[in-house]
Regions:
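Long, low-complexity, polar/charged, intrinsically disordered or flexibly structured peripheral segments
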Residues: 1, 5-29, 275-350
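Preference for the N-terminal adenyl/adenosyl cofactor-binding alpha/beta module
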Residues: 1-143, 199, 262
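Charged/polar, solvent-exposed surface patches and flexible loops
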Residues: 40, 79, 206, 210, ...
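Residue-identity detector for glutamine
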Residues: 55-57, 77, 113, 120, ...
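Conserved S-adenosyl-L-methionine
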Residues: 85-264
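Disulfide-bonded cysteines in secreted/extracellular proteins and peptides
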Residues: 136, 270, 287-290
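Short, surface-exposed amphipathic charged segments that create phosphate/polyanion-binding patches used
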Residues: 264-280
């Protein structure tokens, strides 16, 4: 089963072996992205859009309408969402226009205040509010580790993504590592995104995983007067355990997936369906929805994701070869995710 594939031809004639020859195997449009393709001496093969050359940016804009929203615009739009949720402006930051005409923001000081007396507007309810970035690219609306137009790192105190805001609220309200792990898991499991091109999806997943680690470090490591982390007596910094990081990678890989957002199937999969007739002749099956230009009814591979809140049905039985430990009853088609009437399992607590 393929996890994510390139879904772009940008890398077919751009990767060189140690002898200076082009490598095609593993970098073609339909090839799966594997660790050996992007690590070691190939670790700089996949780069954020801002670091790609201008021609590559233009080509991707023409081919797949790829555009990246400036971070200040992401912030302004996320602020509108929070203004509606909280019922007031400037909850996480205040937008400013600088003298040179550029835009930025000033983070609010102190702990985020939630509406009093409203059980549906608590900090825990905010953390588990479902959110999704469609055609997410590198996911700048979810996390903002760097400015999408300049490539400059953004410090945690100034980050503006939807998940960044959830993590800020968590860091302001929990005391113990156990509390942090529990609430961070909820935040990540309620944050979704999909993307067509595999390299963008890879960068988005990477950004979310680093975000998980960085907010833990920011919460549990003391800082000096300059804001630098102070190591312990053994010269170490506190980081999430290896198992916790692996768990986070699993949530992220389920919640950020590869999909054609118009057809709601795996990209190009309608073109790869074949049928065999009574005489053993194999022919390509035509997708009626593609022919008619319709959104529904595509025959491509359906995108299966997880509704992490679904409880195991009382009469559930595993299918042959199915591992109950993988909680397969949570797997659903993307279309049905936000139609779920499943009650929060943590409802009493949250």
């Amino acid at each position: 089963m393929v996890n994510i594939f390139w879904a772009t031809s940008d890398y077919e004639n751009s990767v060189l072996d140690e002898h200076g020859n082009f490598i095609e195997e593993g970098y073609r449009y339909d090839d799966e992205i594997k660790p050996e393709h992007i690590t070691g001496r190939f670790r700089r093969i996949v780069m954020p859009r801002v670091l790609k050359d201008k021609q590559a940016q233009l080509d991707r804009t023409k081919d797949k309408a790829e555009v990246f929203t400036p971070s200040w615009v992401c912030n302004a739009q996320n602020n509108l969402i929070d203004e509606n949720w909280f019922g007031r402006k400037d909850v996480f930051n205040r937008e400013v226009t600088n003298e040179d005409g550029t835009h930025s923001w000033i983070p609010t000081e102190g702990k985020i205040q939630f509406p009093e007396g409203n059980k549906q507007k608590t900090w825990k309810k905010y953390v588990v509010d479902n959110c999704m970035e469609i055609t997410c690219g590198e996911a700048p609306y979810l996390v903002s580790r760097y400015d999408t137009t300049t490539g400059q790192p953004i410090p945690i105190s100034h980050r503006i993504g939807i998940l960044d805001r959830k993590m800020r609220v968590i860091n302001e309200n929990v005391e113990t590592e156990k509390e942090w792990y529990d609430m961070a898991e909820k935040a990540f499991k309620h944050t979704y995104g999909y993307e067509w091109q595999g390299d963008n999806l890879l960068l988005a997943r990477e950004a979310l995983l680093y975000t998980y680690i960085e907010y833990f470090m920011d919460k549990f490591n003391p800082k000096d007067a300059d804001g630098n982390y102070i190591k312990d007596a053994d010269g170490n910094l506190r980081v999430p355990t290896r198992n916790k990081i692996i768990n986070a990678a699993r949530w992220i890989s389920w919640n950020l997936w590869q999909m054609d957002g118009i057809k709601m199937v795996v990209p190009d999969s309608c073109d790869k369906v074949y049928e065999t007739d009574l005489f053993g002749e194999t022919t390509k099956k035509q997708c009626p929805a593609c022919i008619k230009g319709e959104t529904n009814g595509h025959i491509g591979v359906k995108c299966i994701i997880r509704d992490w809140n679904l409880k195991k049905p009382k009469d559930w039985q595993p299918s042959p070869g199915e591992d109950p430990k993988s909680q397969p009853w949570q797997k659903i088609e993307f279309r049905s995710l936000f139609r779920s009437n499943q009650k929060e399992t943590e409802d009493d607590e949250i």
